[in-house]
From Swiss-Prot:
GO terms for cellular component: cytoplasm. InterPro entries: FAD-dep_OxRdtase, FAD/NAD-bd_sf, MnmC-like_methylTransf, SAM-dependent_MTases_sf, tRNA_MAMT_biosynth_bifunc_MnmC, tRNA_MNMC2, tRNA_S-uridine_synth_MnmC_C. It holds the Pfam family Methyltransf_30. It is found in: Cytoplasm. This is tRNA 5-methylaminomethyl-2-thiouridine biosynthesis bifunctional protein MnmC. It catalyses: 5-aminomethyl-2-thiouridine(34) in tRNA + S-adenosyl-L-methionine = 5-methylaminomethyl-2-thiouridine(34) in tRNA + S-adenosyl-L-homocysteine + H(+). Catalyzes the last two steps in the biosynthesis of 5-methylaminomethyl-2-thiouridine (mnm(5)s(2)U) at the wobble position (U34) in tRNA. Catalyzes the FAD-dependent demodification of cmnm(5)s(2)U34 to nm(5)s(2)U34, followed by the transfer of a methyl group from S-adenosyl-L-methionine to nm(5)s(2)U34, to form mnm(5)s(2)U34. The gene is mnmC. Its EC number is 2.1.1.61, 1.5.-.-. It comes from Pseudomonas syringae pv. tomato (strain ATCC BAA-871 / DC3000). In the N-terminal section; belongs to the methyltransferase superfamily. tRNA (mnm(5)s(2)U34)-methyltransferase family. Coiled coil: none annotated.
Amino acid sequence: MTITRHARIDWDEQGNPRSHDFSDVYFSTESGLDETRHVFLVQNDLRRRFTELPVGGRLIVGETGFGTGLNFLCAWQLFDECAPVDARLHFVSVEKYPLSQGDLQRALVLWPELSRFADQLLGQYVAIHEGFQRLVFDNGRVTLTLLIGDALQMLPQLDGQIDAWFLDGFAPAKNPDMWTPELFAELARLSTPSTTIGTFTSTGWVRRSLNAAGFKMKRVPGIGHKWEVLRGAFIAWPEGVTSVPAAKPWFARPTPLAGERKALAIGAGLAGCATAQSLAQRGWQVSLLERHAAPAQEASGNPQGVLYLKLSAHGTALSQLILSGFGHTRRQLERLQRGVEWDACGVLQLTFDDKEAQRQKQLAEAFPESLLHLLDRRAAEVQSGIALNSGGLFYPEGGWVHPPALCHAQIQHANIRLIAHHQALELRRVDDQWQVWSDAQLIDSAPVVVLAGAADIKQFSQSAELPLKRIRGQITSLPQTGASAALRTVVCAEGYVAPARLGEHTLGASFDFNSVDLTPNVADHLGNLTLLQEISADLASRLEAADRPPEQLRGRAAFRCTSPDYLPIVGPLADREAFVQAYAALGKDARQVPDIACPWLDGLYVNSGHGSRGLITAPLCAELIAAWLDNEPLPLPRSVAEACHPNRFALRGLIRGGGK
């Protein structure tokens, strides 16, 4: 994979940014705001369209070339001025060379009238790395999905429909790759007959190429030094051009449900709380069912979880999910109290054997230094504050999180109602509603249910066939000492240890595939102390670990929940028996796609199987659930969403034979 690097900026005497790579300005130095508003807001008729949005309506803007974010901020300012209070703006923008946060801040200082919006953008402009990066503003009223990478690699991965296009990027003569028939075909693929487009260039071949892609473009008067600009609308795919084939039926989007926007999320751990938040921010009324007295009482209840990216150098679906999910979670954490609810202290993964050393070398070659970089032993000791036996790979944006704090923050929304002390045991479909029962008691009902209760969702007949498995894990808590306060970062080898939170260090964690007993045991405490010794004998000594009677150690045990391919299970559920019947032909010839709609269990979704990565994957997967439900652009590449889809297991079973 290619390493995304930041834009190289040259600054003129007035403080205006200029691209070093493309030898072009990011915006007009004479009339930047006026030009942006005229070319993109006026030509797409956004004032009227924002004003006329219906109750709960939304408008989706697509952009080629995020640059300094000026177009986004101007669109947000106009939306804030004239859209209904419950309307939403979703802005999707592709950018090959994102500005660093420092350069972005320096550029946006030039526009003081946008400072209210620019400050919010800068506050969330962290962990911007390769792939799909989602940023959320104003309690979900405004969403920004950045596609970081080459436009012709990123746009084909986007699944969604755009209402208005901002065709930007540097001038065609400076950046011809952004003005090709192939790119215009992608814009057409993502458009509908009501989609509009505006661009600053009036070059004849650009107009003709857009027309050939299915748009109808015309020149209109420009502003400032721009005599003319282009505006247009998507009409239809031209004759002789084949439209993009639909998704395979088992991965197609279910028809959006009409009527009451009410949902039930079952399970108030990380997955359930994040799902409730994502839906509530879109205007859904959400009941969050939890069998315990409060959220985050099981695997999400540990005092410290590590924000650690176990990546692949080969761009796998899991690696893409982790990179996008990490950024999304990291931005959510910016709203929590640092030092108590989370800390961006970094994560150091030690080079504990030759195989790990080779893996780390490959990762360091595949990803930018701002995400991860190698440290030799001496540098690792300086970074961590303790003596070590080796160097390792350092993730400067990582750290630790108090998961219950994140869960509680996610459900602080007027649209979310927590129903505690209720254990959902059965789902029944009655009159387009899902009823949730506990023995003879009807707990609640709604047209939509999201199963977020880890492996416990297998108790429902509708999800019983999902191949989820439990893995018991135990952590150990050790009191901070004067000497252990030197630890400055999370350090991992086979286990992990975190800097102290409220006077206690967390270390762990055990993996037990067989035990179902959640009582902390001495054997696992001893195992965790061994992991600590392997990480750093110096830190073990500082923590006086050898002097602590194992039977007096405090800790906590819970079940992780994972799938056979270690990807989470996220998306709409189908009727398993009807699915096997509908697509039985795949068992004979996997290349033949039956023209049969997927037998969805309308309104039933799952967000589970996050394993030990829930902090990183669950919040973004909640956004994926919301996108499925509300027919929004997906927050992940289509291929990654399909890799996480619940239907993947039944599909593999059919192709391999046996329908399992």
